[in-house]
């Protein structure tokens, strides 16, 4: 694979969420959100650690009550080296409390956080604690006056007006450590809203399609919206919102970044769908291998082709590849065909062995490593 992207990133200011740089050319950060009850500290910490193992850069936690804020205090003490974004709605006092407890970023929703006085209180607190803010506009919870103005139709214009209203507030307060999102559940509205916002401000943008749906449908819609924006150079952090295990959100996010050659993380599988020419069951091999090496974060290309039509050509471009042949298939490593062929019944085991050996060689300390970038 050509590991250099031609995408020109939109210029933006630099902020930090914990120790993670955002914007101004920093690697695009992957964010997810726990779906546990925050007051269940053990379950929440367990899920955060699982997300971290999957490669997540930033984790968001919903803080709906003061009890949740108190739980957040303990969670923050137990989570090491993973920045936590506190998701705040309705009660601005919760934002003040979690900022005191070490939140790395405050997500506020302009549609329900309250009047300007309350927003100023949150901003002053963030300034005192030197933490960032995300202005998180969402099509499902816009301000009442904007809903009335636009007859309840959450178009890109409504999202943009809501965002700019609060950008102006933060600017007037001389607060610049913030990023902005304008999410809709509609792919085209999301794209149009972010395009418009990107042309008006230079703050980092957090991109995503809100409430995208279940795994398959949500992945397709998110890939369309997020991939389209990334290809235009728009986006500094991403979150794929799926109604499934949040680990899948992280996987899909990295799949999108890898497909656009923006950020390499884990294995890029190249595999044929299988046909009458296949000499081994490609589908079974791919599915089994993908599961077995899901813990590998070292970037590499692995091609699994069931016959000699395209197999050798793909293998020559891959880190590790197999080209199907009768009884024994050809194995390639770094574009070189290996002298010893592999029994077709042992392909899964042989490829896993080679992948793990290559991962250890390329990155001896491969244990939830910080993902690399293609264009770093």
Curated annotation (Swiss-Prot):
<keyword id="KW-0560">Oxidoreductase</keyword>
<dbReference type="GO" id="GO:0005506">
    <property type="term" value="F:iron ion binding"/>
</dbReference>
<feature type="binding site">
    <location>
        <position position="307"/>
    </location>
    <ligand>
        <name>[4Fe-4S] cluster</name>
    </ligand>
</feature>
<feature type="binding site">
    <location>
        <position position="314"/>
    </location>
    <ligand>
        <name>[4Fe-4S] cluster</name>
    </ligand>
</feature>
<feature type="binding site">
    <location>
        <position position="275"/>
    </location>
    <ligand>
        <name>[4Fe-4S] cluster</name>
    </ligand>
</feature>
<dbReference type="InterPro" id="IPR045854">
    <property type="entry name" value="NO2/SO3_Rdtase_4Fe4S_sf"/>
</dbReference>
<dbReference type="InterPro" id="IPR011005">
    <property type="entry name" value="Dihydropteroate_synth-like_sf"/>
</dbReference>
<feature type="binding site">
    <location>
        <position position="272"/>
    </location>
    <ligand>
        <name>[4Fe-4S] cluster</name>
    </ligand>
</feature>
<keyword id="KW-0004">4Fe-4S</keyword>
<keyword id="KW-0414">Isoprene biosynthesis</keyword>
<dbReference type="GO" id="GO:0019288">
    <property type="term" value="P:isopentenyl diphosphate biosynthetic process, methylerythritol 4-phosphate pathway"/>
</dbReference>
<comment type="function">
    <text>Converts 2C-methyl-D-erythritol 2,4-cyclodiphosphate (ME-2,4cPP) into 1-hydroxy-2-methyl-2-(E)-butenyl 4-diphosphate.</text>
</comment>
<dbReference type="GO" id="GO:0016114">
    <property type="term" value="P:terpenoid biosynthetic process"/>
</dbReference>
<dbReference type="GO" id="GO:0051539">
    <property type="term" value="F:4 iron, 4 sulfur cluster binding"/>
</dbReference>
<comment type="similarity">
    <text>Belongs to the IspG family.</text>
</comment>
<protein>
    <recommendedName>
        <fullName>4-hydroxy-3-methylbut-2-en-1-yl diphosphate synthase (flavodoxin)</fullName>
        <ecNumber>1.17.7.3</ecNumber>
    </recommendedName>
</protein>
<dbReference type="InterPro" id="IPR016425">
    <property type="entry name" value="IspG_bac"/>
</dbReference>
<dbReference type="GO" id="GO:0046429">
    <property type="term" value="F:4-hydroxy-3-methylbut-2-en-1-yl diphosphate synthase activity (ferredoxin)"/>
</dbReference>
<comment type="pathway">
    <text>Isoprenoid biosynthesis; isopentenyl diphosphate biosynthesis via DXP pathway; isopentenyl diphosphate from 1-deoxy-D-xylulose 5-phosphate: step 5/6.</text>
</comment>
<keyword id="KW-0408">Iron</keyword>
<keyword id="KW-0411">Iron-sulfur</keyword>
<dbReference type="InterPro" id="IPR004588">
    <property type="entry name" value="IspG_bac-typ"/>
</dbReference>
<dbReference type="Pfam" id="PF04551">
    <property type="entry name" value="GcpE"/>
</dbReference>
<keyword id="KW-0479">Metal-binding</keyword>
<dbReference type="GO" id="GO:0141197">
    <property type="term" value="F:4-hydroxy-3-methylbut-2-enyl-diphosphate synthase activity (flavodoxin)"/>
</dbReference>
